[in-house]
Amino acid sequence: MTDSNDDKTLSVTGKKTLTLKPSGMSQGTVRQDMGRGRTKAVVVETRKRRPMRPEDEKPITPAAPAAPVRAAEPAPAPVQARPPQPTPAPRVHQPGSSQANQRPQQSYQPQRSNDRPRPVVLNHLSPEEMDARRRALAESQARDAQDAIRRAEEEKRRAAEEAIRKAAEAEEAARRAAEEAARQAEAPAAAEPAVAAAPAPVVTEARPTAPRPASPAPAARRPDGAGAPAAARPAPGAGAPAGARGRRDDEGDDDRGAARGGPARGRVVRPEPAKPVTTRPKTDDERRRGKLTITTADVDGEDTGRSRSLSAMRRRQEKFRRSQMQETREKISREVVLPETITIQELSQRMSERAVDVIKFLMKEGQMMKPGDVIDADLAELIAGEFGHTVKRVSESDVELGIFNIADVEGDRVSRPPVVTIMGHVDHGKTSLLDAIRHANVVAGEAGGITQHIGAYQVEQNGQKITFIDTPGHAAFTAMRARGAQATDIAILVVAADDSVMPQTIESINHAKAAGVPIIVAINKIDKHEADPQKVRNQLLQHEVFVESMGGETLDVEVSAKTGKNLDKLLEAVLLQAEILDLKANPNRTAEGTVIEAQLDRGRGSVATVLVQNGTLKPGQIIVAGDVWGRVRALVTDKGDHVKEAGPATPVEVLGLSGTPQAGDKFAVVESESRAREISEYRQRLARDKAAARQSGQRGSLEQMMTQMQSTGIKEFPLVIKGDVQGSIEAIAGALEKLGTDEVRARIVHSGAGGITESDISLAEASNAAIIGFNVRANAQARQFAERQGIEIRYYNIIYDLVDDVKAAMSGLLSPERRETFIGNAEILEVFNITKVGKVAGCRVVEGKVERGAGVRLIRNDVVVHEGKLKTLKRFKDEVSEVPMGQECGMAFENYEDMRVGDVIECFRVEHITRTL
């Protein structure tokens, strides 16, 4: 590249870098108007065509030296023509300028048109170089062929896109014409002024004519067609408006015609009047907008090379058609499920309406609400009806519908084993009898030899299975006995032949009658010498239990758990009673049943002993038990075996629950985790509401609390109870509740199944409570924390000891009993005023005696005036401890001197006696 066109030598300036341009390329810069007086230099490159045939090659005249410089200058305005250039001389066969501009290193050698460049023979090339040249030539030819194929495909694609665009434009024009015709047909009155004003836009004849230059600007049109580089011509749409581009396109056609050696399309170029270029005035927004976007590219129908997509055009047509035909979308009426309470936002979502519309309706009704406000079902039903929807009202309890008490087809029901509950008084041999039946030794594992848990077992007799439920007999386990009676088919009432009917025996009879289950009386301990079975039968008559031997319908069997006598007869009686009851269940359905017992095991987590009453329970199923749910991880029998399924009347331990359910809760299998979570959350809400209502009912206002404390003086003994199973905790809570009196009661701050943890210690510290562990222990961290905080932890494994210790501790909270003992009376004979001592009463003891330090009352006219203690008691001048009746003495009161002659002084002794519950 050189600084001037005259210098043909290859040189590099100090400020420019040496670059090689591809052949056939010319480059220039133009100035693009950016608006508001701003311009930008744009580099434009143009590729020239090569002559494909030797006869098409035209002799090219050299370009004027100043032409490239002027081409690079910015145009003064996009709508004005370039300054007129002198008409170039006729074409003469001169060296081609295009090659000279593109390859400045080649010298310009004049040659005639009939002279052809002779090939240069390179004799000094080696064979390897010749082969490389041939390979390069072959590769170049292959690339040219590929480029030609690519260009052909590109032309085809452009032609197809142009056809699609023209078809869309034709469709749009036809649609607009049809719409215009429809509007004119519908509104003939409005069409008349439009027709009258129609000729007004025709102003082409009134345009001022101006002589057009005979020769256009060289930059716009060149006679030789290749004199100036393409950089002098800016790209379409770069800096000129649409009008100027249209004119230049026409001039381009003339250029192509002139390039073929004559006027364009055989016409003589004559001067034409210059058409005024109409430019649309720019608005402020367009002046500020310097960025070209798709939205702003197609303005007022200008042909900028972009067009809307077919999808956008269809959407636009559909929208316009709706607006013309005034179509309204069909209102969809939906069935809206309304709970007892719902937020406005959720209601609008269920109706598929906007929350704003719902709020507007409420504002019209005079209610100002927000989308997050909660409304009741009545208002929600009114809103849904206003919006044209139907309503289905449900309650929160409907989430439990369809999971319990599902009716079965009679043909699907098959016989199932009976569920037998062993009930009776404590120490009457219930567990020993069950051990003899199961050939096990459960009694040895029970603390104190008494049953404190409810257990479920299954035995087999003559090929038939029997499920036994063992209940505690202690008075504290009333709830356990009630649960056992409700979940059973047959109740075995165990009565000791040497002890006859006892209070828990009567309670068990009442539970069985309340549950409506038949009773089988097992008279135990007949191996003892003092046993009297007939006495037991006679006592049962008092409680409306009529055995068969006494003319009734209740079966009775005399058994001995120690020797195993008549155990087979007892099992036969159970099977006979089960056959009479005709017990059936459907194993081919989802399982449901009752939680017998639940505990928190350290290694296995929450463990629930359940009795399947219907259906079949399998691992992997999702169950809901009370307010907890979980996926069954394993099923364990009473013998410790893992089973794959548990059918009707089968007791198993279930592992995998999210929490520890309450004993006595119903459980059922549900289809999904979402349903289980929904039921669990509903039951948890119910439990929280009940607890809050109970606490609020107990708490009341501060004034009520103070009044109650002053009037009743009830003291509370706070406790934190942790047990091994839920049933034991329930029994302990019930037993402690019975210890309460009008003055003191036990308040259970927290109770739960599982070991004692640090959180229990923190809770006990905050509430100043003692911690009781029943068959559980505290971990090392909890013990250390309790020692640091000074919290007492007591461990028990027998409920007797627990109740006795709590009873003694609660007795200490009772205010001691104040017992007053009369000592004697003295009459005041004279009152003396002694310096430094005060008033001293001279008295005579008229009844009993007077003791120093005892309590005294000053009685005047049979009214107690003062009550206090004696300060001094003297006989003559000596201090004495007591003065008997008939003697005189001097007495002075503490902090009281209003004594008069004739007053009576009563002396008494006060004793405080400790009370017990």
UniProtKB/Swiss-Prot annotation:
Region (G2), start-end ranges: 449-453
Similarity comment: Belongs to the TRAFAC class translation factor GTPase superfamily. Classic translation factor GTPase family. IF-2 subfamily.
PROSITE patterns referenced in this protein's UniProt entry, alphabetically: G_TR_2 (PS51722), IF2 (PS01176)
Region annotated G1, chain positions: 424-431
Occurrences of domain tr-type G (ranges): 415-582
Intrachain disulfide bonds: none
Composition bias, Low complexity: 63-74, 90-112, 184-209, 217-244
A GO term, aspect molecular function: guanosine tetraphosphate binding
Basic and acidic residues biased stretches: 126-183, 246-258
Alphabetical list of InterPro entries matching this protein: EF-G-like_DII (IPR053905), EFTu-like_2 (IPR004161), IF2_assoc_dom_bac (IPR013575), IF2_II (IPR044145), IF2_N (IPR006847), P-loop_NTPase (IPR027417), Small_GTP-bd (IPR005225), T_Tr_GTP-bd_dom (IPR000795)
Span list, region Disordered: 1-327
Functional note: One of the essential components for the initiation of protein synthesis. Protects formylmethionyl-tRNA from spontaneous hydrolysis and promotes its binding to the 30S ribosomal subunits. Also involved in the hydrolysis of GTP during the formation of the 70S ribosomal complex.
Localisation per UniProt entry: Cytoplasm
Binding site for GTP: 424-431, 470-474, 524-527
GO CC annotations, alphabetized: cytosol
Feature: compositional bias, Pro residues: 75-89
Region G3, residue ranges: 470-473
Protein name as catalogued: Translation initiation factor IF-2
Region ranges (G5): 560-562
Ranges where the record places region G4: 524-527
Ranges in coiled-coil conformation: none
UniProt key word Membrane: no
Any Pfam family matching the protein: IF-2
Keywords assigned by UniProt, alphabetized: Cytoplasm, GTP-binding, Initiation factor, Nucleotide-binding, Protein biosynthesis
